[in-house]
Amino acid sequence: RRSSDLVAINTKCKGYRIFKALFFVPTVFPLTAVGLMWYFIFMPTGSFNSLLEVIGLSDLVMPWLVDPATAMNTIVFVNVWAGVGYYMVIILAGLTTIPDDVYEAAAIDGATSIQKFFKITVPMLKPILAMCILMDIIGSVKVFDLVFAMTGGGPNGLTNLPTTLMYNEAFKYNHYGVGSAIGIDRKSV
């Protein structure tokens, strides 16, 4: 497919605008609200465990945010869910910059859709994908509100990030010097 075809899907497919809006909406919400919403969903008596029971997957019911094996993965999932719409818009904008001539030349040479994707689309989006990855890494380092709203750094400090550790040391345990040192160390990074 040509890049214009990929972008033009929004006018050809039914429900694409709703799909795009549903993907982008989480980006607009404050991370504290997102964290609290998912906290209630992943509670032991929350809607996710209830759904698992209803569809017959009772063996998978667990305290997602309390179990050390699943707490960090659950937070990562929520963080990805909250940010995927932002990167979707950036990548869609990048798709519009790929010239149609390249895809037409590949079609004449007999390239399949998969070959076009991996040999044309991905390489031409590489700078945009690299920027998205860099922005996500920087954003992940400074996450506080999502982790604080969902676990507060628990269980047993397993989901502590430098920001939540700094907050807990300074304001929960009244170790102001340690909290300040963590903040200064974070500033130098």
Predicted regions and their residues:
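A structural signal for multi-pass alpha-helical bundles of membrane permease subunits
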Residues: 1-188
